[in-house]
């Protein structure tokens, strides 16, 4: 799987960072999923190879505008791009009427079926290759994280089962390897029943706003990637007197270290953190605070940067 960050700023955009949006890209590269859709997300997409036509589903973590205000515009552009495939949007129930009324009031016609599903009722969303579940987080409003788990990754034929059932080698095996249903000796065989994963499924967690990382304990242990907000550093919190429902880099890093997370990606940085090394506070303050508590692979997400989760288990920036 790959991650491509479309927005990494908290609350408001900056010249270098847009507000929250993260693309999760299937290992095959053919389809992708969007977590959160802050204002201007569709503009960011224009600077990537991602196509709205290949978007399988949208997941919104919570109701705050920096995570959802880009949704109506993105949907309208999807319609104007000629998309015809249904699109499922999993989002807080309170936003459903807002989306529908916005489209009606703006006389926006969608040539595809828009399916709005309440995130509060989501047990598991599935495609052919991924399962998505939720974990409840802690914020000023209800917020969730989305857990992406691969289904049967890089499937290969279960030769032992085929031999055990006496299914003769030949062209039929090739059909089964494609997951097709075939007839053998008068019986229907579903190819998916004869495929097994060639490696363990990978698990990637993309979180909404959260001030209690420990709520992720059950799903984060041994996770391949945890994407979590680090809105502040401890030094800033000590000056401002509160986190306003957000986490510091130190809090997230300590949790990730204890949970054994292989790759920690920090995002959703306060606009006060500068990229200019001559100004303070600097974004490196976030990195330094996290590194003091976390020994795994640490990444500070950058807008429009794509990251690849390789076979070695490391998440690394793509060229």
Curated annotation (Swiss-Prot):
Catalytic residues identified in the record: 66
Cofactor note: Binds 2 Zn(2+) ions.
Required cofactor(s): Zn(2+)
Residue numbers binding Zn(2+) 2: 66-67, 209, 268
EC number in record: 3.1.26.11
Any one Gene Ontology molecular-function term assigned to this protein's record: zinc ion binding
Keyword Mitochondrion annotated: no
Superkingdom as given in the UniProt entry: Bacteria
SUPFAM superfamilies: Metallo-hydrolase/oxidoreductase (SSF56281)
Annotated catalysed reactions: Endonucleolytic cleavage of RNA, removing extra 3' nucleotides from tRNA precursor, generating 3' termini of tRNAs. A 3'-hydroxy group is left at the tRNA terminus and a 5'-phosphoryl group is left at the trailer molecule
Binding site for Zn(2+) 1: 62, 64, 139, 209
Keyword entries, A-Z: Endonuclease, Hydrolase, Metal-binding, Nuclease, tRNA processing, Zinc
Coiled coil: none
Physiological role: Zinc phosphodiesterase, which displays some tRNA 3'-processing endonuclease activity. Probably involved in tRNA maturation, by removing a 3'-trailer from precursor tRNA.
Subunit text: Homodimer.
Matches recorded under HAMAP family: RNase_Z_BN (MF_01818)
Family: Belongs to the RNase Z family.
Name listed for the protein in its UniProt record: Ribonuclease Z
Gene giving rise to this polypeptide: rnz
